[in-house]
C-alpha cells in the first residue's frame, strides 16, 4: 500500500430540511389552524482519530464527502428527521488545515478525538411558528439553511516515541526490523526506504514503545534533495531521536563525522524546534571492526563531535547491543512520562491578594 501523508479533500454538510405550510384538516373542523412542522437539521461532517490507520492512502480515490440532508417537516406539526452526521476516520497525528488559507483547524492526537469540519444547515421553520393573535392562518414558512462546504488539507505527522535519523544506508531499517515486527525493505543501496515505517518495540512482557523509520537524509534535504525531506515532519512529534552513524571502515565517500554534521544541519534548517528533542548517538555496524577497537572508535567519534549526550555502540544486523539500547529507551520514556504526570498534578501556587 502506498504511503500518503498529505491530501486535500472536499467536505460538505447536509442542508437543513424545509419547513412546510400545512393546515389541520379534520371532519367537522372548518378552520383547523396551521400545523406545518419544522424541517430537520442537516448532518455535520466530523473527522475522527483512529488507531487502526497509519496513512492517508484511503483518500487517494475518495476526495468528496457529504453528510445527509435534513428531511422536510410534515403536517400535524411533525418535525422532519435530522440528517445523519458523517464521521471520517483519519490516522492519529492528523493535522487539519483550511486549504485556501492554511489556517490550522485542529490536531487529532487522541484515539476517538473528533473535529467538526463542516456544520450542518439549520432546520427550516413550519407555518405553525408564524401563528399569532393577528395572523391565525399564516401561509409562510422558512427553508432550511445550507450546510457548510469547504476544502481542507489533511497532513499526517506520525505519532511515535522514537524516531530514527541518519544518512541512507546507516542501518535504520535494519534496526527497526531487528527490534520490532516491522518488515521494511532492506538492501545494500541508498534510498531502499521510500516511505516511513512504524514498529512496536516490546521491552519485557508489559512495556513497549513505537519506533519510526523515515528515508535517509542527504545534504540539501531541507531544500528538497533526496527523499527524506518529504517525511521530516514525522520526526517532529518524537520524544527521542536516535541518530545512527555508519561506523564500518571508512571509504572515500563515507565519514561518520561528516555524515553527522550534514544530517544535523539539514534537520535544524528544516525546523529549528528539532534542537529541543533529545537526541542519542547510535554507532552502528561496529561488528565490522575488531572488538578491541570498539571503545577506541566510540571515543574518537565522541571527541570529534564534542558529543555530550548519550551514545551507544551496536550492530543492528547482528543484534549486538540492541537489547541494551531498547531497555535504555524504555527507561527514559518511563521517566519522561512520570515527570510529565508530576508536572500536571502539581497544584498551582495560591494567588496573593
UniProtKB/Swiss-Prot annotation:
InterPro entries associated with the record: G_OBG (IPR031167), GTP-bd (IPR006073), GTP-bd_Obg/CgtA (IPR014100), GTP1_OBG_dom (IPR006169), GTP1_OBG_dom_sf (IPR036726), OBG_GTPase (IPR045086), P-loop_NTPase (IPR027417)
Enzyme class at the top of the EC tree: hydrolase
Superkingdom of source: Bacteria
Binding site for Mg(2+): 173, 193
Keyword GTP-binding: yes
GO annotation (BP), single: ribosome biogenesis
GO cellular component annotations of the record: cytoplasm
EC number(s) recorded for this UniProt protein: 3.6.5.-
Binding site for GTP: 166-173, 191-195, 213-216, 284-287, 315-317
Protein name: GTPase Obg
Organism: Dichelobacter nodosus (strain VCS1703A)
